[in-house]
Amino acid sequence: WQKVLDNLKPGDYVFIQFGHNDEKADPKRHTDPETTFADNLRRYVRETREKGGIPVLFNSVVRRCWFVEKEKNDDDEKLRTTTFDAEEKINSDTLVDTHGAYAIVPRKIAMEMNVIFVDATRITHDIESQLGAVESRKLHMWFLPGEVASIPKGRKDNTHYNVYGAHIVANALADAIAEQVPGLKKHVCHYDYVVSAIGRGNYLCLQDAVDAVKVGEKATILILGGNWKKPVHTEGKKIKLVKRWGANISRD
């Protein structure tokens, strides 16, 4: 936080979201929702304002939990390296809340301190619920053994998003931010495909993204950095290429 504060300039927006790790039993990470957790949020808001920044509070995105008795989860970080052990036992027809007071307190602090608030819990709850118990897996690092070459033993992580899920949630939250902060609306842009050679998009290769666009379809492709060959086979496709982070396209 001190690094953020040291670099904060008047007029900067500071997006503040905590909760997932505060819920853990580990005393090195745990905070109490009504005391230490709330006090930390107040501190971040207060110190942001003291530097001339504009705080925006979010509550936590939901976990994908369709279990009345949810699976034991001591540490979300461990899920990044776990392998697929068995099919899950879905026993709820509605998404089950795992955050409790940690999702409520940020809203209370926002009202108390007159801070802009984005309800990330509700937004992501709706996204997961609309997809349903099985289809919502495709948002997360949830892969069967052999489904993804780089994760041969599979993975069953209901907390962290894969690239597709991150893209869906980021789009939804960007729209929500624009609603709460009209001054930022002009900066919100949506893209159909994102290309990044270092894995920050849903395609590693520009040509692959172009090939994914159907003939007759309109598509906007964001290119994040890198040097790329001009794509071919674009006939009949209405493609707009947007370059960021020094991206360059050449004929060679």
Descriptions of predicted regions:
Residues 192-222, 227:
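Acidic Gly/Asp/Thr-rich repetitive segments characteristic of extracellular carbohydrate-active
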Residues 3-167, 171-182:
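Alpha-helical cap/lid subdomain in secreted, periplasmic
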Residues 1-2, 203:
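Structural motif corresponding to alpha-helix initiation and N-cap regions
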